[in-house]
UniProtKB/Swiss-Prot annotation:
Organism (species): Nitratidesulfovibrio vulgaris (strain ATCC 29579 / DSM 644 / CCUG 34227 / NCIMB 8303 / VKM B-1760 / Hildenborough)
Family indicated by similarity: Belongs to the QueA family.
Recorded GO MF terms: S-adenosylmethionine:tRNA ribosyltransferase-isomerase activity
UniProt xrefs under InterPro entries: QueA, QueA_dom1, QueA_dom2, QueA_sf
Protein name: S-adenosylmethionine:tRNA ribosyltransferase-isomerase
Length: 371
């Protein structure tokens, strides 16, 4: 589907809306799956208020649901400088792409038993950091600053001793979104992961939040009703929370994220398309994988690499027929994606109704089905 974009659709100000602070979910529902679902027919504009547990009642027959199987890494480290000053480091490079260097860095040799890799991350400290500064995060993790970039993004040398995923699980904190105004807790270790998350896909710094609503029971119900499943991988980057800053959104430089689509998933989607069965993206991350690969390659094919696709009104969707998604921040690229799918004015009108009806917004909030 291609939305007939107008000049107003390209203005950043066209994606602003007023959201009361108490509509931003600070915690997950008491139980996984106890979320609300707002169904929007993007052709007629009809809206239905439902429960997410009743998703099967609102999906077309024989739908193929495509979910993101990436897992959130406790990627936020709290440490100190040699002088004792406190520092924070957030690993941005997906864990599977952290490749130990064959030889020690130019700044010195690597101690026996230690590994080192050049990675990207966010650094925060009470006093400015400079190239060459060394930061410690427990006994087995440390970082040396190589180059500082914009908005805190930096290239660093990451030194570790032992198994890296285990070290982050022990020392790290889940990087909850900035609009969740509390520290991460034990409940987040479970509830900020989806039922699709795979251990060998550990490396996202944010959850693919549409997947948070699904339970094993709901998956079984959907399968029993004749729906099918497929998986893709997108390692969600911190750029997902970055606002669009350009007055004309077409000037926005989109952040890139690493994605994977297997030959098996491609074949399942091709068969669904051939049979006339709709492809339902579980979340904007799954949507970005499918549309990003199809746009870059001209067709959907197996792929492992980067995508920086930016979808806004006027974009023609090539793979995705329906979209399950949460409610998104004002002036965000994700709100623009949803507007490309269902129309900006229709989406904003739906958001206003959701606010009036008491829906919970953002990562731990309620969901929409755009069909």
């Amino acid at each position: 589907m291609k939305d007939d974009a107008t000049g107003a659709d390209f203005l950043l100000s066209g994606y602003d809306y007023e959201l009361p602070e108490d509509r931003i979910a600070q915690h997950p529902p008491v139980e996984r799956g106890l979320s609300r679902l707002l169904v929007l027919d993007r052709t007629t504009g009809e809206r239905i208020h439902a429960r997410f547990a009743d998703l099967a009642e609102h999906l077309p027959e024989g739908a193929l649901l495509v979910a993101n199987n990436s897992k959130v890494l406790p990627a936020r480290l709290l440490g100190h400088r040699p002088t004792g000053g406190k520092v924070e480091f957030l690993l941005l490079t997906p864990l599977p792409l952290v490749t130990p260097l064959a030889a020690g860095p130019a700044s010195g040799t690597v101690e026996p038993g230690w590994c080192v890799a050049e990675v990207e991350g966010l650094l925060r400290a009470s006093k400015p950091l400079r190239p060459g500064d060394t930061l410690s995060f427990g006994d087995d993790l440390r970082v040396e600053v190589v180059h500082k970039g914009e908005f805190g993004r930096s290239m660093v040398l990451l030194f570790w001793r032992g198994e890296l995923a285990t070290l982050f699980a022990r020392e790290g904190h889940l990087p909850l979104p900035p609009y969740i105004r509390r520290a991460d807790g034990d409940e987040d270790r479970d509830r900020y992961q989806t039922v699709f998350a795979r251990e060998d896909r550990l490396g996202s710094v944010a959850a693919p939040t549409a997947g948070l609503h699904f339970t094993p029971s709901l998956r079984e119900t959907l399968t029993a009703r004749g729906h099918q499943w497929a998986e893709v991988t997108l390692y969600v980057g911190y750029g997902t929370f970055s606002p669009v800053r350009c007055a004309d959104i077409r000037d926005h430089a989109m952040h890139r994220e690493y994605v994977e689509v297997t030959a098996e998933t491609v074949e399942v989607i091709r068969r669904a398309k051939a049979d006339g069965r709709p492809v339902v993206a579980v979340g904007t991350t799954s949507c970005r994988v499918l549309e990003g690969v199809a746009t870059a390659k001209g067709t959907l094919e197996p792929y492992a690499g980067w995508t920086d696709i930016f979808m806004y009104p006027g974009y023609t969707f090539k793979v995705v027929d329906h979209l399950i998604t949460n409610f998104h921040l004002p002036e965000s690229s994700l709100l623009m994606l949803v507007s490309a799918f269902a129309g900006r004015e229709r989406v904003l009108a739906t958001y206003r109704e959701a606010i009036e009806e008491g829906y919970r917004f953002f990562s731990y909030g309620d969901a929409m089905l755009l069909r």
